[in-house]
């Protein structure tokens, strides 16, 4: 079966978040099961030159963009048994700064989605499945169904649409309906791609794809309800029989403390006690923390946005500063949350360290050098950081929501089982109590090391998830 993964980013070529990690890892896992796999993404101007040098030009495209025709080109790169296709258009994709948030994002990703479909018309091997990801490719299943179903070559193609984060929906003015998408008014309805009087690319994917997935079973259930549904819970409930939750994995080769060259000292299950101490000291020195082996160090690596629980941290930040532990923050995002981290760092020198921005080496050092890892998310579709931290022997402290609930087993003091610590309600003092519990267990060394052992030996690979995706694809066979 030929499966194309269509996404706006994929590691290692371009990454702004977890989407790129998934599209970088899942195709390899599915290919390992014997499927013929390709990935299609834009050719951004900021892709590293080393990768660009490996790309092979295939052919040009003329892509309908409303009443206009836009030029594009398709390039190809083979890597680790996967064929990567890159859609090139310098006007849309050779821009400085961030990938998203441009004034013409509706047009940029409409162009990309139609370019993928136009590209298929020039290929000898037509894909059986187009697996689209998040709002940036949500319009593709709608294009396929509305503009291409009359063409025989496209009639057997089926679509899978994965929701990585329902909060980001790709919402645009009604005017693009005809001018850009070339859809008639019959599609601008509550049953179609309209939501609150606007065109919604995420909803287009939900309405027009053949199957829908989310990135964890619990998140799948949560988004059926208004609290988590971001206004689209009704559309999701209507398609509920076609929606399934399949848990993300992580790339075990990239995230391996035994081979990770980004950390101060590598370690494994037998040597983690010594290895983590070396990394802890390096992390403390890097962030200006007091260098102490005996104090618990709690890491935090995340986008600093409302989803990630920064308001809980802010609500008890004075109490956190008085705890017998240290904090290491890494991330960037909304100015008000960056300010909270700055203020905590200034108020508690030697106890709170931070870096505003993103540094992949520092991120890995936090995973390796911390004792615990804080993720108090308001919602979390899956989360990858908790999986990485457990693989590195760093126990997560999480709010039990979405993928965090599915992946972190809270500590049971009676059975000594668990891989981390959890709290249920989105409440600052409940989070604080859970951190205090983790600190107590940290000093019960036998119990703590038993938890670390369980965390490091759990399976965080794509193996089981890839099998579930393969079963989903073969529903169409």
Curated annotation (Swiss-Prot):
Catalytic reaction annotation: [(1->4)-alpha-D-glucosyl](n) + ADP-alpha-D-glucose = [(1->4)-alpha-D-glucosyl](n+1) + ADP + H(+)
Keywords carried by this UniProt record: Glycogen biosynthesis, Glycosyltransferase, Transferase
Pfam families attached to this UniProt entry: Glyco_transf_5, Glycos_transf_1
MF-aspect GO terms: alpha-1,4-glucan glucosyltransferase (ADP-glucose donor) activity; alpha-1,4-glucan glucosyltransferase (UDP-glucose donor) activity
Keyword Transferase in annotation: yes
Enzyme Commission numbers on file: 2.4.1.21
InterPro entries: Glyco_trans_1, GS/SS, Starch_synth_cat_dom
Superkingdom: Bacteria
UniProt pathway: Glycan biosynthesis; glycogen biosynthesis
Annotated ADP-alpha-D-glucose binding sites: 15
GO biological process: glycogen biosynthetic process
Role played: Synthesizes alpha-1,4-glucan chains using ADP-glucose.
Similarity comment: family membership: Belongs to the glycosyltransferase 1 family. Bacterial/plant glycogen synthase subfamily.
Name of the protein in its database record: Glycogen synthase
Species, as recorded: Exiguobacterium sp. (strain ATCC BAA-1283 / AT1b)
Gene name of the encoded protein: glgA
